């Protein structure tokens, strides 16, 4: 497997529950390195830009409102097969359908307040990482 980078966001619901450290432990225990991180309170414009791919979907407005409702923790994860590994750690989008022991099964409340975001492909990962960490703000470890 190739070494990959992926973007991960710990969403406002999980930040409010004070489980950032528990989620970071899962990343690191799975062999993923956190190579960049920052806390941010997204503006409406930032959330609309980041989730722009969904702008014509019925849930777009609610997604943007949720993502600006409180601070988020944004990180870049690196490791072998990082994209798939992170998606496995996250679990299904709907926490009720997520496998036991996944981040969403353990920390999410609903399909909307589902604790985490993760890139779904190498192409989207590159775009998402560049969106939040432009230039030289990401470091190999």
UniProtKB/Swiss-Prot annotation:
- A molecular function (GO) term: ATP binding
| Reactions mediated catalytically | a 2'-deoxyribonucleoside 5'-diphosphate + ATP = a 2'-deoxyribonucleoside 5'-triphosphate + ADP; a ribonucleoside 5'-diphosphate + ATP = a ribonucleoside 5'-triphosphate + ADP
What InterPro entries would the database entry show? Answer: NDK-like_dom, NDK-like_dom_sf, Nucleoside_diP_kinase, Nucleoside_diP_kinase_AS
Q: Is DNA-binding among the key words of this record?
A: no
Q: Where in the cell is it found?
A: Cytoplasm
Which keywords fit this entry according to its UniProt record?
ATP-binding, Cytoplasm, Kinase, Magnesium, Metal-binding, Nucleotide metabolism, Nucleotide-binding, Phosphoprotein, Transferase
PROSITE patterns registered for this protein in UniProt = NDPK, NDPK_LIKE
One biological-process term from Gene Ontology? Answer: GTP biosynthetic process
Q: Any idea which residues are catalytic in this one?
A: 117
Q: Which HAMAP family match?
A: NDP_kinase
NCBIfam families from the UniProt entry: PRK00668.1 (NF001908)
Function text: Major role in the synthesis of nucleoside triphosphates other than ATP. The ATP gamma phosphate is transferred to the NDP beta phosphate via a ping-pong mechanism, using a phosphorylated active-site intermediate.
Name-wise, this protein is: Nucleoside diphosphate kinase
Q: Name the encoding gene, please.
A: ndk
């Amino acid at each position: 497997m190739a070494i990959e980078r992926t973007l991960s966001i710990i969403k406002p619901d999980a930040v409010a529950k004070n489980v950032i450290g528990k989620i970071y432990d899962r990343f690191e225990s799975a062999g993923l390195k956190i190579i960049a991180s920052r806390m941010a309170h997204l503006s409406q414009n930032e959330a609309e830009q980041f989730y722009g791919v969904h702008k014509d979907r019925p849930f777009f407005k609610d997604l943007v409102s949720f993502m600006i409702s409180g601070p988020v923790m944004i990180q870049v994860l690196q490791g072998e097969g990082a994209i798939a590994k992170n998606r496995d750690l996250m679990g299904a989008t709907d926490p009720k359908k997520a496998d036991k022991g996944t981040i969403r099964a353990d920390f999410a409340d609903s399909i909307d307040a589902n604790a985490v975001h993760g890139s779904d492909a190498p192409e989207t990962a590159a775009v998402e990482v560049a969106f939040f960490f432009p230039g030289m703000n990401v470091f190999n470890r």
